[in-house]
Every structure is written in structure tokens, then in C-alpha cells.
Amino acid sequence: INGMTLDLMGVPCDDVVLVPPHAVLKTSSGKIRRAACSDAYEQGRLGGAARPVWVQLGHVVLAATRPALHRLRRSVSAATFAVYAWIVFWLLAPPTWLAAALLPRPAWVWSTLRVMARLLARLLGVRIHVTGASHAAVDTASVLVANHASYIDGIVLVAALPQPVRFVAKAELLRGFVARIFLSRMGAEFVERFNHEASSADARRLAQITHMQYPLFFFAEGTFTRVPGLRPLHLGAFVAAAESVVPVIPVAIRGTRSILRDGSWFPRRGAIHIAIGEPIDLASLSSETQGDTWRAALALRDRTRSHILRHCGEPDLS
């Protein structure tokens, strides 16, 4: 019969199945669940004995609690990592600070800081990927400029950069004993952000010292927030580079904001990417600047910002 039906009509005949009441699966509004009925028929479950109510209720409860249990597991895992991260940090921080305060040579201080920063990243399972490291490993004077995304940017850069630098930090950090000693021993330069006259004097001072042993490193955004995105870059770093006629090396930081955001002390797992660009030489901008220092600073800023925006993985907030 099935063969004749297929020959005459081109389709197999329907299979009529007699099932007990309530065997046809329906929605809460009474509509037939055709896909579910088809699956039950193909698996031989259509018309079988109904499962006990307590079994059905157990399946419903399990289906409802499974996502909650998954969220709970993730929350516990994240909290465990955060506690572990702070324990590791506070175990490494005191000997690191003491080494910075007591070692007599800046090169020794930087070597110790680099070892401790890399050890911290390794113990926390945070991978730091660096591209273009050779661009920063130059013997000539230069100014490095990066975006600022998190409290941990400085630690990451100490671990990632191929040579020591002198971070340019806000003068407010001088008020704290711990920060003042630590940053001063690193060779940091402090600038005033809110006093215009002092800020101008700091800019002139930085322009005069760009040819010293280690290059200056600026976080040109000036600050960071929880909101992802690249903010406008302040001109101080670029004016210093233009006045002293040294190249600017752009550095893009990606991933640190998601690990430790502004206003949060709950570190999370993640990976970090550092993209170091080719030095931007004033000679390559001569057609745009025409020998004018201010135009040179603007051109350096625009080129640097373009590199950072391409590699930081965040939107443009300018």
C-alpha cells in the first residue's frame, strides 16, 4: 500500500497513530506543538506512558535552576580570582617598594620592577602581548605617548617596555609618602595640572630634559574613566617633543580597562595587548608644519592619536 501510494501520489501516505488523551503536546494556549510532536513520534515516545508529575516537576525545576547555578559558579570563580589577585599583589608590593627605595642605581630599580611586574602577570595568568617592541628600543632621545585606561597601566608598561622610561605623573601624587618615594626612585617627572603658570613652566622643563638618559613617557589623556573610549590628547607631550625636536613613539594599550576599571577594586581575568608604533619624526611632517612648533605639536598629536585609536579597541570620544 505504501509503495502504490508513493507511485501514484509522489509522497508517502500519512501514518495515523492512535494515542491516549493528553499525549499530543500542546502549548499553554492549546496550540499543538508540531515540532515537539514530530520529535516524540520519531523517537517512539508519542503515546507512551506519561511521566509522573513529580518527575515532570523535577525537570522544570532543574531547567529553571541550571542558568542560576551557572551564574553562581561564574560569580564565585570571579570573586575567588579577585581575592587571589589582591593576595598576590600585597605579597609582592612591599618588597618591590623597598627595592625601589633602597637600591642605589635607577637601572637596578627598573630591573627589579620589571621582574616583579612580569612575575605578577604570570602568577595571575594575565598574558601581555607586545607588538613593535623594537620601535621603543632606540638609543636616541624620544617621547612615548600612550592612552590611559586603568590603574594597572603603569605596571603593565614596566613589564612590557624594552627599556626604562621616565613617567610623567601628576603633582598630586607627591603628597603621598609611598607614591612619592616609589615614583621618584623610578625617575618620574611630576607636572602641575591645574595651575596654568606652573604647568607652562613644567612643559618648558620637560622640553629641556628630553635628551636625558631615559625617554619621557606621557599618558596624554590625562586621566581615565569607566567608560571605554579614547579621549582627546593633551598637547604637553607633543609641545615638548616639537620644541626639543625629538620623535614621538605612540603606544596603544588594550585590555587593561576590562581587568580593573576606574572606581572598581574587583580585578578580573583578561589579556592585554600593547601596540608600539614607529617613531613619528618631525622631518616626516615638514610639509605640514613649515617649521612652526605649534603646527608640529598638532601634527604629532594627530598622528599619535590615529595610531592609538586603531589599536586600542575602543571608540573615539573626542
Label every PLM stretch briefly.
Residues D7-K31, G48-Q56:
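AMP-binding/adenylate-forming catalytic domain of the ANL superfamily
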Residues C13-L18, I128-V130, I274:
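Generic structural signal for residues in well-ordered beta-strands
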Residues S38-R73:
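Acidic/polar alpha-helix N-cap and adjacent early helical turns
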Residues E42, S200-S318:
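Non-catalytic C-terminal accessory region of glycerolipid acyltransferases
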Residues P67-G125, H129:
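N-terminal membrane-anchoring alpha-helices
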Residues L92-W110, A121-L123, A137-H196:
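Catalytic core of membrane glycerolipid acyltransferases/transacylases, capturing the structured
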